[in-house]
């Protein structure tokens, strides 16, 4: 299992652009209608919609009773299903933690791996309920990285995302994580992906920021390599 130095399943997407008063600061027992309306109000602005889904996932980590009631009241809701699938991935990652793989207990790693297939299944179910929504595909890309999908499998998932939203910010960030050297790629593959995103970005898109994430990822790894070299050098003297 490759390691990640970031807490959770990867970098966050843009902050929702709604005013603080319109965001659900909490979802107390059974109060799911505000959450449903909050996501629905984003319409087909898929980046904004995903940002709202991410916020609901965070709220559900504290108390998911409202989410269960939402799903019970509207089992056909793709939004509720997407929040649930993302929550499952986040909970799996919370058990694994952000430490290097060799520092994660075998029990935690086993539980992490055992939870991920269910999260992937939940994301597929969400995509069937909301076939036009790229959100479930972001969840799939996140889970696929930890499930060790090969390059072909992952590329097919990413193609599914792009069919729905070719410039989706969070989807590209998850893909960048997959292609970086600490997971299933290399520096070359990571930069190739980032350059393609940069070249494809339409005017005004935030997608060129993916390249900045690649530079940051490379810088962090270079810094860790330098620290390791310095420690080895000091140990030899």
Regions found by a protein language model. Give the residues of each.
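Beta-sheet entry/capping signal
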Residues: 77-79, 168-170
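Extended, hydrophobic/aromatic-rich amphipathic alpha-helical segments that build helical scaffolds
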Residues: 78-90
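Extreme N-terminal leader/anchor segments
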Residues: 1-74
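Charge-dense polyanion-binding interfaces
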Residues: 205
